[in-house]
A protein has these predicted regions:
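N-terminal beta-alpha supersecondary unit
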Residues: 2-86, 220
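Stable alpha-helical structural segments in soluble proteins, enriched in small hydrophobic residues
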Residues: 66-70, 105, 123, 223-234
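Surface "functional belts" at beta-alpha junctions
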Residues: 3-6, 16-21, 48, 54, ...
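DPxDG-like acidic metal-binding loop motif
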Residues: 81-110, 115
Length: 260
């Protein structure tokens, strides 16, 4: 692995103005993590992590595979992109820590990617006629991480890297009921699969929650989606110093709330 890393190390850790040729993306905020390698002009290579194993175990081997692939293709890893949240506390923490360490070790640049903004982008790509996207990720404890975006505002936010400003925490019931009563065809709701099951989940029973069957699209963020989003931030040079990249948990953990 050290030999593979040596191939990727550049001469300037402090600030590199060279074009990004190869990007490694990390997605660990959901139930199924993944790693993606996206070299200039080549089809992205996605590695799905085994959900039955701990991310800390599977990330290392997947990253080693990507580094080997970049060496074989002769394209160094110039940038690491990572989903910084919101999402699973443990998954986000592992992903961000891995990305920071890797970016520092490879002397490459780092892009911090907002999970809800990626989700909105997936929906906008999937539905070209949709003007407004309201996306949700599972925050557990009958809560959701939510962001609502107008298409033009979402696109303009790349200029100042302000996507995270739209992130909110909602009661799950509020989002479900809004999705159930919205009839405007230009507004689309989408969420990860576990969110659409909330109403019937005995662990998250919400008797006052209206059915959203057939009204909400499901989506799952992959590292390839993270990479696609990151390339747009690369165009605006929104790089983060490796040691300054932090998770966006958006709220306290259950343990932290008990201490308050």
């Amino acid at each position: 692995l050290n030999e593979l890393i040596d191939f990727n190390v550049s001469s300037d850790r402090s600030g590199n103005s060279q074009p990004v040729r190869g990007l490694l993306a990390i997605e660990s905020g959901g139930r199924s993590g993944s790693i993606a390698w996206d070299g200039s002009g080549l089809p992205p290579h996605l590695i799905a992590l085994d959900p039955a194993k701990r991310s800390a175990v599977t990330l290392a081997s997947a990253i080693a595979e990507v580094i080997a692939r970049s060496r074989h293709e002769g394209i160094p890893i110039d940038c690491v992109a990572v989903n910084v949240g919101p999402g699973s506390f443990t998954g986000i923490r592992i992903g961000v820590t891995t990305a920071k360490t890797l970016a520092y070790a490879l002397s490459c640049r780092l892009i911090a990617v907002d999970a809800l903004a990626v989700a909105a982008g997936i929906l906008f790509d999937r539905q070209p006629a949709v003007a407004t996207a309201c996306v949700a990720l599972n925050a557990y404890r009958q809560q959701l991480f939510v962001a609502t975006w107008q298409r033009n505002d979402w696109q303009n936010a790349f200029q100042d890297n302000s996507h995270a400003a739209a992130d909110e925490v909602w009661p799950a019931e509020r989002w479900h009921n809004l999705a159930a009563i919205t009839t405007d065809a230009s507004v689309c709701f989408a969420a990860e699969p576990s969110v659409t099951r909330f109403r019937d989940d005995t662990d998250c029973a919400m008797p006052n929650c209206q059915s959203i069957a057939g009204t909400v699209q499901t989506l799952e963020i992959t590292a390839e989606d993270v990479a696609q989003f990151a390339w747009r931030l690369v165009q605006h040079a929104h790089f983060v110093p490796a040691l300054d990249c932090n998770p966006n948990y958006l709220r306290d953990s259950a343990a932290e709330e008990k201490l308050r």
